[in-house]
């Protein structure tokens, strides 16, 4: 049974419109734009962005705070772990109804394959509002070289799979035309008409390779509206990639010309150059919807944008550029003397959007601070304010690490807390944990590392190794114990806090040896994903080792999921 909860999704003073009643194929208010967030599906396809089920659940709960209409939490048939994560989100997040009746649609992604569709339905059917999102390529290059099927065969598959999805009991079905912007127009109109007749309630127009200009996408939406049989009875959606840096502009133009569902990701993460950014699209609509976009609006609670962005950044390991619009470190920082003078006289001189609208706090650039005298309740409250829903034992675990840090640093900032939670979020699921570490390095001879790891079964294992530097020797020692061939794809260090007692965040990205970096494919061939790890410590080497273990444990859990599938 759905549970009644009170969420902030309807409490922002900016939300003057009521959310229209949810009907799969119709929006009672023609000015309302649905937001489908695919951070947990397409966003996770970014190399190194693989997330655990717990991390996905945390982000899904944060998306509810935002008031996202549809959450696409994954591709259930990709692996057993993906299936379980989507099912858990459907059960827990997909039944949390707020006081205004809002509950997100939980949408499982699947190819136009019966097994995929059945698996996706088994994962999402527990939600109050389940949806199936099935997709097939419609462009000549994809049909010829990837699918190796004729137009007639693709149309038949699309028709049959939408009907099959309907037969399972799902009444909310999205059909996606992959690479729609490079598809033959007449063929696109035809296949969309066929799936609408078969029972699709939303049709998704994908600019899969991010190749079109805004005017071209707008013209495509208008042409689809004018030439597709039955199009008035469904919702038109867009899914824009950012290969030319036009994803946000294309998405806004799609909405202006008739799309009433927009697929986006937090921070714009996704395949290759990423997807349209939720924060950019939503704030563009909020800022210009009344004046330039004929009154278009969403029900996104923008005050939760920043904390959601930071959570996704930490869990995915995808660091933001400082100049990233709205959520980058420099987005509301004014360094020029002329700009500072203008800001002192009137903030509107250089800010058209108030940073408070998206959750920034001007009181300090690094957030509210806690110290060594702070208790667990103060810590719990601050973690809740930052968007983290931790169990009692998880808070206790973070608390003792927080106290240890506070003894050394005197003050612990929001950034410190987020780094701690980011590590703890996965640490509980670890197969291997760091016991002890000793490293000898310098200008004479090779570096030597001695590592003790603790296995999930309680056994301890010790190994020594030499290498070129502390990191190399330590990783080699770990590999002697774990015996899992890996390749280090990326390694970076970042000082995430201010002051003398610097807390260093290490981020690593690994894959299995001889692996491709692509994390997703529509083919039957399994492409091993890449895995990122992030950890924060005051000791650079310890931080680096813990980050590597986080990534390594994710890889091992991923292998386990295939054995269980």
Curated annotation (Swiss-Prot):
Any GO CC annotation of this UniProt entry: chloroplast
Keyword Amino-acid biosynthesis appears in the UniProt entry: yes
Residues involved in a divalent metal cation binding: 42, 239, 241, 275
High-level lineage: Eukaryota, Viridiplantae, Streptophyta, Embryophyta, Tracheophyta
Enzyme Commission number(s) from the entry: 2.3.3.13
Low complexity bias spans: 1-15
Catalytic reaction(s) noted: 3-methyl-2-oxobutanoate + acetyl-CoA + H2O = (2S)-2-isopropylmalate + CoA + H(+)
GO biological process, one term: L-leucine biosynthetic process
InterPro entries: 2-IPM_HCS-like, 2-isopropylmalate_synth_dimer, AIPM/Hcit_synth_CS, Aldolase_TIM, LeuA/HCS_post-cat, LeuA_allosteric_dom_sf, PYR_CT
UniProt KW keywords: Amino-acid biosynthesis, Branched-chain amino acid biosynthesis, Leucine biosynthesis, Metal-binding, Nitrogen fixation, Nodulation, Transferase
Protein name per UniProt: Probable 2-isopropylmalate synthase
This protein's record includes keyword Metal-binding: yes
């Amino acid at each position: 049974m759905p549970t009644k909860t009170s969420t902030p999704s309807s409490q922002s003073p900016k939300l003057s419109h009521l959310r229209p009643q949810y009907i799969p194929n119709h929006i009672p208010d023609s000015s309302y734009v649905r937001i489908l967030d695919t951070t947990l599906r397409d966003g996770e396809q970014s190399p190194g962005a693989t997330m655990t089920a717990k991390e996905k659940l945390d982000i899904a709960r944060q998306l509810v705070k935002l008031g996202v209409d549809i959450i696409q939490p994954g591709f259930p048939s990709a692996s057993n772990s993906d299936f379980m994560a989507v099912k858990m989100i459907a059960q827990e997040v997909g039944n949390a109804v707020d006081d205004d009746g809002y509950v997100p649609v939980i949408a499982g992604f699947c190819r136009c394959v019966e097994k995929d569709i059945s698996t996706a339905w088994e994962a999402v059917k527990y939600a109050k509002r389940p949806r199936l999102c099935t997709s097939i390529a419609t462009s000549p290059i994809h049909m010829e070289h990837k699918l190796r099927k004729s137009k007639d065969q693709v149309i038949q598959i699309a028709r049959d799979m939408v009907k099959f999805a309907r037969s399972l009991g799902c009444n909310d079905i999205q059909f996606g035309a992959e690479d729609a912007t490079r598809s033959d127009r007449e063929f696109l109109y035809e296949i969309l008409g066929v799936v609408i007749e078969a029972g699709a309630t939303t049709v998704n127009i994908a600019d899969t390779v991010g190749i079109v200009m805004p005017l071209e996408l707008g013209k495509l939406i208008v042409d689809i509206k004018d030439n597709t049989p039955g199009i008035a009875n469904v919702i038109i959606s867009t899914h824009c990639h950012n290969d030319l840096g036009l994803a946000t502009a294309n998405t806004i133009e799609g909405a202006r010309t008739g799309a009433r569902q927009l697929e986006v990701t937090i921070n714009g993460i996704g395949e290759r150059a990423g997807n349209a950014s939720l924060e950019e699209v939503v704030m563009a609509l909020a800022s210009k919807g009344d004046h330039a976009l004929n009154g278009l609006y969403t029900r996104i609670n923008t005050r939760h944008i920043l904390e959601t962005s930071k959570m996704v950044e930490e869990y995915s390991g995808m660091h933001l550029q400082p100049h990233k619009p709205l959520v980058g470190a420099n987005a509301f920082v004014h360094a020029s003397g002329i700009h500072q003078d203008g800001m002192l006289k009137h903030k509107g001189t250089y800010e058209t959007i108030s940073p408070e609208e998206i959750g920034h706090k001007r009181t300090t650039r690094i957030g509210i601070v806690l110290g060594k005298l702070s208790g667990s309740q103060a810590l719990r409250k601050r973690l809740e304010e930052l968007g983290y829903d931790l169990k009692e034992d998880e808070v206790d675990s973070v608390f003792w690490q927080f106290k240890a840090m506070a003894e050394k640093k005197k003050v612990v900032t929001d950034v410190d807390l987020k780094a701690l939670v980011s590590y703890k979020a996965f640490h509980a699921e670890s197969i291997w944990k760091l016991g002890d570490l000793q490293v000898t390095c310098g200008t004479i001879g090779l570096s030597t590392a001695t590592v003790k790891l603790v296995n999930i079964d309680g056994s301890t294992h010790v190994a020594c190794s030499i290498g070129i530097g502390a990191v190399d020797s330590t990783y080699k020692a770990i590999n002697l114990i774990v015996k899992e061939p890996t390749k280090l794809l990326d390694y970076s260090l970042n000082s995430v806090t201010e002051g003398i007692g610097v807390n260093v965040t290490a981020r690593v990205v690994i894959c299995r040896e001889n692996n491709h970096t692509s994390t997703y494919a529509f083919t039957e061939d399994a492409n091993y994903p890449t895995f990122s790890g992030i950890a924060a410590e005051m000791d650079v080497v310890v931080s680096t080792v813990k980050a590597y273990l986080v990534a390594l444990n994710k890889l091992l859990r991923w292998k386990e999921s295939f054995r269980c599938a």
